[in-house]
Amino acid sequence: MANKIDFGANSHVETPSKSEAFFIKFKKQILIAVVAIIVIVAGAVLYNAYVSGPREDKASTALAKGQQYFNQEQFDKALNGDGASYAGFIKIASDYSGTDAANLANLYAGLCYANLGKWNEAVTTLEKFSSKSDAIISPAAMAALGNAYANTGNIDKAISALKKAADMADSKAADDTNNSLSPTFLIQAAELLESQNKSDEALKIYEDVKKKYVNSQVVQSSEIDKYIERITEK
C-alpha cells in the first residue's frame, strides 16, 4: 500500500512504501555531491565559464557575496539577502535578467531552496537555469534538478534528469567517460528505479556503470557490486 509523504510545505504525494525508505535515507544528503561540486568550482572557474565582459562586472560583484554565504551554508541569507549591502540571489537573478550572472544566480538560488527543504521552489528555480557546454556545472545543475524532482515526488522526471546529467558529463569527457560525476548520477537514477520496483532497469544501470566506468571510485572499491548483489539476491 502507498504511504503519504510530505515533500514540502504544501506538497503531499502518494508513493510506494519503498520510495518512502529511499527519501528518509537521502532527504538530508541528496544534494551533498552536487553542492560540493558547486562549492569547489566557485569563484574563478565559475567566473570564467559564465560571467565575463564589462557588462557582467556589476552582476558578478553582486554574486561574490552570495557565494560566500552559500559556501558558509547560510542559505537563507544567500537566497534573500543580508539586509545590508547584499541583495540575494533571487534579486540578482531578477535585476540582471538575461545576463550570465543572473543565470548562475538561478542555479545558486535553486540549490539554496533545496538545502532549505523547499523543493517545489527548488524545481521552479533550477528549471530557469540555462545549461552551457561545460563539463562540470551544467551536468551538476541537471543532477540537482533531478534530485529536486525526486523530492517533489516526480520520480520519472527525476530519473530522466539524472540520466541526462550523466550524458552531459560524459559528452565533455575523454573517451566519453566521466568517472567522477556520471556514476554518481546514474546510481541515483537506478536507486529511484528500485523505489518503483523496476529492478531489471536498475540492474542494467548498475551493470553498465561497472562496465563503462572502470576507473571510477565506485567500481575500483567494488561498491558497485553491492548494488548489483542487492538486486540479484532478492
Which ranges hold each PLM region?
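N-terminal positive-inside, membrane-proximal cytosolic segments immediately preceding the first
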Residues: 1-36
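Short solvent-exposed coil/turn linkers within tandem alpha-helical repeat scaffolds
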Residues: 53, 93-102, 116, 131-139, ...
